[in-house]
C-alpha cells in the first residue's frame, strides 16, 4: 500500500447503494487510478449492513466499513420517514456482531427537514436514536460519522452534551458560525464535490481552518452535477476547490485532509499499511 500521507481519503460514501450494483469494480478501479487510498463506506439502515461488511472483505484495506442507523429511513422519495427506536433495536445486535471490524459508527445524526421531522415527537425520537448510537460509539471507542441536515446546531449541541470526541460532520449545511462551534469542540467537517454548485458550502470552507477539513463524496449523491451519479474519483474536485478558496496547492489540501482523516479514524493508519 502507498504511504498513507500521499493519497486521498473519501471519508463518507454509500458504496452499498443500488446505483453501484452493476459496476462497482469499475468505479473502485477508477478511484484507485485517481489516487484514492481509502473509501469510508457508511450505512443508513440495518438492511445494508451485511452488504457493507461483504464489500469491506472483498476490497480489504480499501473499503472501510461504518455501520449505523440514519435519521431518515425508508426508500426515497415516497417511503421515507423519520427513524424510530424500533429501527435501532433491529440494528444494534448486528453492529455488536461486527464491532471489532468497524472503522466508525455511521451514518448517524439528526434530520429536521420538515417533511421528515414535522413534529416534536419525531425530533425527540431522532435525538434518542442518536444518543444511543453516540453511547455505543463511546463504549466501542469508535468515531461517529454524522448527518445533520437542517439540524446543524441541535446536532453539535447533542454531540457535545453526550461527550462525543471523534466526530465527522458530513456535508454540513448550517451556518459557518455554527460550524465554528464544532471546530472548537475538535470536530471535523467533510466537503463533497457539490461544493462547486453550493454557495453555502463555499462560505463554509472559507471559514473552516484546513486542520478541521476532510474530503468526502457522499457517492452516489452530492456530485458536481445535479441528478448525475457521483463517484469516489470525483473527490479530487473537492480538493481542487478547497485549494482555490484557500489559495494553497492541491497537494497541501490532500496532505492535510488525509492527515486529518488519520486523526479522526485511528484505525485507518493500520488499515492503510496492510
Curated annotation (Swiss-Prot):
Transmembrane segments: none annotated. Its main location: nucleus. InterPro entries: Metal_Hydrolase, TatD-like. Changing residue 107 to Q: Increases both AP endodeoxyribonuclease and 3'-exonuclease activities. It is found in: Nucleus. Zn(2+) 1 binds at residues 12, 14, 107, 218. Disulfide bonds: none annotated. Changing residue 107 to A: Reduces AP endodeoxyribonuclease and 3'-exonuclease activities. One of its GO terms (cellular component) is nucleus. Its EC number is 3.1.11.-, 3.1.21.-. Exhibits 3'-exonuclease activities and apurinic/apyrimidinic (AP) endonuclease (in vitro). Show preferential AP endonuclease activity on double-stranded DNA substrates and 3'- exonuclease activity on single-stranded DNA. Belongs to the metallo-dependent hydrolases superfamily. TatD-type hydrolase family. This is Deoxyribonuclease TATDN3. It comes from Homo sapiens (Human). The gene is TATDN3.
